[in-house]
Amino acid sequence: MPRSTAILLTLTFIVGLLSLLVGAADVTFSSLLSGDAESLELLLISRLPRLLAILCTGAGMSIAGLIMQQLCANKFVSPTTGATISSAQFGILIALLFMPDSTIWSRAAFAFAAAIIGTWIFVWFILRMPMKDPVMVPLVGIMFGNVIGGITSFLAFRFDMTQALSTWLVGHFSLVLRGNYELVYLVVPLIAIAWIYAKWFNIVGMGRDFSKNLGVNYTFVLFSGLSIAAMITASIVTVVGSISYIGLIVPNLVAIFKGDDLRSTLADTAHFGALFVLCCDLIGRLIILPYELPIELIIGTLGSLIFIVLIFYRLRFGRRSLNKDLLMKLFGFEKKTPVCTSINGGTR
């Protein structure tokens, strides 16, 4: 196991144990080990499902962003900037309008379909209009997502569904309980499929001509990968609501240190995404204990700041990985070429 993966797993395990103990009700390891019925019930019904949902959310959104960035060959594409989240919310609204008593699985079906179609339209659009500036791609995605979000808000207001839709507009884990979160487990097999086809995703990321030269069906692999990313996103949005920036910043941070190969970075991206969401959730629960802040607020604040830093980094250094020389250049310490002095006193 790589050292980075082992460190991330250890940190996730430690923070995960702390997460099980934090909440409005007191739960301690001593009460759990002593067999206290109330503590065990709280652990199994609320705390453990919440922890599992957090881990699946962080890993899933990070991998969805990684897949989209690899396929589109643009480090600023993600479920947030690719209209995937907005499309999933639109699908949930359609399910609520036509089936007010729909189950979580029927809402998920509409969210899957809408997220896949919305993501396909976005990618089809940027393929038809190649943009020289990589920053323009997420801007187009954000505008497209805002159009879908505006239609969603209008329909929700028109049919008096604003209150019902609000649950999916702001991501939070406060309503995650045993029996209503299991849909998020779909993230696990979808990530496994992404790992299996990582080599083909890497090839497609090189471009249409490169893919054809290697005998890879560019269009099929592209839209299959986008469908996987959209389904991961839709399953998470259906359970916990909209959570922005994870799929954007986590793959970029991992790529800075590990490079751009999807298969070699997939595990660390999933682990770091899970750890990042877990830490943000813990912060949101501790700030105003016994109350909690929505995780979308914490991640939105941190994510927007990191996103700005990433824009400047990518514009300056491109897709290069971080190394010692790049760190020195980043902080203003240029590497100087040593001057050799000859025996006669001259320089060469």
Positions of PLM-derived features:
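Alpha-helical transmembrane segments in inner-membrane proteins
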Residues: 1-348
